[in-house]
Regions:
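Iron-associated oxidoreductase/ferritin-like identity signal
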Residues: 1-76
Length: 76
């Protein structure tokens, strides 16, 4: 039995923001929480493990900036 996949519209009729805006806000929140956690983990680490957390922080910050830019564009 083949079925076509239809895009889901999860928008709540009275919601003040679109699904995309909400998703971007949630993703940004998660990324900022990850940055905070990785900064703490980095303090405990040394050597290669510390470098790993440094690399993760660089990536997390870059991703957070991209999410913020996308959110700004969505809110225009």
């Amino acid at each position: 039995m083949a079925t076509e996949t239809q895009p889901r519209d999860r928008t709540v009729p009275d919601s003040p923001v679109s699904d995309v805006t909400y998703d971007l806000m949630q993703a940004l929140t998660s990324k900022l929480e990850a940055i905070e956690a990785h900064e703490m983990y980095r303090e405990d680490a040394h050597g290669d493990v510390r470098q790993l957390f440094d690399d993760m922080l660089d990536d997390d910050r870059r991703h957070a900036e991209r999410l913020l830019d996308a959110l700004r564009m969505e809110l225009r």
